């Protein structure tokens, strides 16, 4: 029996409690999750935009894809940095094929000059990681209220959604998992 395998790769220091919550949430969908904390992968300086003081998410992900050697259904990179794509002021995450990167900087309360809140930060990170995993597994944005696959244009949008897939999105993942088990 083959489970869908997810690899989480940290590119910067991420608190262990956050990693544990990510694993717990994804495992609840029957996904096998591995963690690579000391990946020797990094954010390429060539992808840093010095005028914006942000990483170009497409350049970062293209670079990481080019040097990967992992055999997983979904590979998620985490960076406690700020990212953007052309046409947007920022992105929380970006997915290309089965690779995704999540930028954590704007998920922190401190970014908005508010008091640090590790619990809220953890919830936001889990939601955005789950969202990007959904994209790597073929899900698109969902309009079902509260679904983790809702598009988030702001941290308030992240706060409105839950850390779980709606029934329809969960069913799609279950169907994919059953298909992979038959291979």
From Swiss-Prot:
InterPro entries: MetalloPept_cat_dom_sf, Pept_M54_archaemetzincn, Pept_M54_archaemetzncn_arc/bac. The keyword Zinc applies. Transmembrane segments: none annotated. Its EC number is 3.4.-.-. SUPFAM superfamilies: Metalloproteases ('zincins'), catalytic domain. Binds 2 Zn(2+) ions per subunit. One is catalytic, whereas the other seems to have a structural role. The active site is at residue 132. Zn(2+) 1 binds at residues 131, 135, 141. Keywords: Hydrolase, Metal-binding, Metalloprotease, Protease, Zinc. One of its GO terms (biological process) is proteolysis. Its cofactor is Zn(2+). The keyword rRNA processing does not apply. GO terms for molecular function: metallopeptidase activity; zinc ion binding. Monomer. Probable zinc metalloprotease whose natural substrate is unknown. Belongs to the peptidase M54 family. This is Archaemetzincin.
């Amino acid at each position: 029996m083959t489970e869908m395998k997810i690899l989480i790769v940290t590119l910067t220091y991420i608190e262990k409690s956050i990693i544990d919550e990510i694993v717990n949430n994804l495992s609840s969908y029957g996904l096998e999750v591995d963690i690579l904390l000391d990946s020797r992968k990094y954010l390429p300086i060539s992808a840093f935009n010095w005028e914006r003081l942000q990483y170009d998410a497409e350049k970062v992900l293209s670079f990481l894809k080019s040097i990967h050697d992992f055999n997983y259904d979904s590979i998620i990179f985490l960076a406690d940095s700020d990212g953007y794509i052309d046409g947007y002021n920022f992105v929380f995450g970006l997915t290309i094929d089965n690779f995704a990167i999540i930028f954590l900087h704007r998920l922190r309360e401190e970014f908005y000059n508010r008091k640090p809140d590790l619990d809220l930060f953890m919830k936001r990170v889990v939601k955005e990681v789950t969202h990007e995993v959904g994209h790597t597994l073929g899900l698109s944005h969902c309009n079902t209220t509260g679904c983790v696959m809702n598009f988030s244009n702001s941290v308030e949008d992240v706060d409105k959604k839950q850390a779980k897939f709606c029934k329809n999105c969960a069913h799609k993942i279950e169907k994919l998992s059953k298909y992979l088990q038959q291979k």
